[in-house]
Amino acid sequence: MTSSTLSQPIKQRGWFDVLDDWIKRDRFVFVGWSGLLLFPTAYLALGGWLTGTTFVTSWYTHGLASSYLEGANFLTAAVSTPADAMGHSLLLLWGPESQGDIVRWFQLGGLWTFVALHGAFSLIGFMLRQFEISRLVGIRPYNAIAFSGPIAVFVSVFLMYPLGQSSWFFAPSFGVAAIFRFLLFLQGFHNWTLNPFHMMGVAGILGGALLCAIHGATVENTLYEDGEQSNTFKAFEPTQEEETYSMVTANRYWSQIFGIAFSNKRWLHFFMLFVPVMGLWTSSIGIIGLALNLRAYDFVSQEIRAAEDPEFETFYTKNILLNEGLRAWMAPVDQPHENFVFPEEVLPRGNAL
C-alpha cells in the first residue's frame, strides 16, 4: 500500500474572509452585508422624518403648518413634498437650489427627497436582509419575495407617480393627514376607486386579512387537548415533533361549510402568501398607470344621458360630479401657487340638487 506525500494547499484567508466572518457573526442584532445598506439608510430616513415633523414648516412649499413646533399634532404633522417649481430635482443639500444652506434646504422641501430616497433604500436593504438570513439559516426566501409587495407600493406611490407628473410636489407628503389628502387627490383627479387595479388591490388586501383571520381561528379551533394547564398556549413546545392542531378536522369542518376545503397545508399557506402580495403588486401597477395619466373606466354614454336628461342619474354620474367637486374646490387650496379661480357657474351641480 502506497501513501501519497501530496497535501492539499491551505487556502489563505484574506481580509474579505475575516470581514465576512465578523459581519455575519451571531449577535443580538444581526448585521450582515445587507445591514450596511439597511441600518444607515433607515436611521437617516427615520431621523429626517422626526426632524421634519418636529421643526420644519411647509409654509414655503404648500402654505401649511406641518410641524409640532407650529402647533400640528401627530395626525397633522408631515414632511411635505418640495415646491412645484423644484421639478424632479434631487434637492441635494449641496446642490444649486440650497447651496449648502440647511435652512434654505428645509424651506424648499429637501427633507422630503432625503426621507423618500433613504426610505426606499432602507426597504430594499430590509428585503436583502431577509434574503441573506434565509441563505444562512438554510430556508427558502419567500419572506423576501413577500416583502417585494410593500416595496412595490412605496416605490410606485412615492417615486414613480410624481416622476410621471410635473414634480415631486404631487407625491404624498410623509404624514397621516397628508396621506389622506393624497387619497382624495387620487380620487378627484384620477377616479382611482373605479380603476380595476385598485379593485384588485382591495380584493388582495381584504382577502388576505380574511384568510389570516380564518386560518388563525381554524387553527385555534382544532388544537389538540394535550396539556393540563388552564392556558392552552402553555401546552406548546417550539421543538415538539407532533402537530399542534388537526388538519383533518379542519378540512372536515370547512368541507361541511363550503363543500370545498384545503387539504394541503403547503398549498394553503402559499395561497395566503399569494393573495395579499398579488394585491400589492396590482395596485402598484395601477399607480404607475396613474403616473402616466391613463384613464380607467369612463362610462361616457351615462354622462351624456345625464347631461341631457335631468331625471337620469346613476351612482357613476354622481361620483363623476363628486370628482369634479374635489378638483374644483381642492385645487385652489392644494396648489395655491397656481392662483386657480373657479367662478360659481362652473362648479358642478348634480341633477338631484
Curated annotation (Swiss-Prot):
Chlorophyll a ChlzD2 binds at residue 118. Fe cation binds at residues 215, 269. The D1/D2 heterodimer binds P680, chlorophylls that are the primary electron donor of PSII, and subsequent electron acceptors. It shares a non-heme iron and each subunit binds pheophytin, quinone, additional chlorophylls, carotenoids and lipids. There is also a Cl(-1) ion associated with D1 and D2, which is required for oxygen evolution. The PSII complex binds additional chlorophylls, carotenoids and specific lipids. GO terms for cellular component: host thylakoid membrane; membrane. Pheophytin a binds at residues 130, 143. InterPro entries: D1/D2, Photo_II_D1/D2_sf, Photo_RC_L/M, Photo_RC_L/M_CS, PSII_PsbD/D2. Photosystem II (PSII) is a light-driven water:plastoquinone oxidoreductase that uses light energy to abstract electrons from H(2)O, generating O(2) and a proton gradient subsequently used for ATP formation. It consists of a core antenna complex that captures photons, and an electron transfer chain that converts photonic excitation into a charge separation. The D1/D2 (PsbA/PsbD) reaction center heterodimer binds P680, the primary electron donor of PSII as well as several subsequent electron acceptors. D2 is needed for assembly of a stable PSII complex. This is Photosystem II D2 protein.
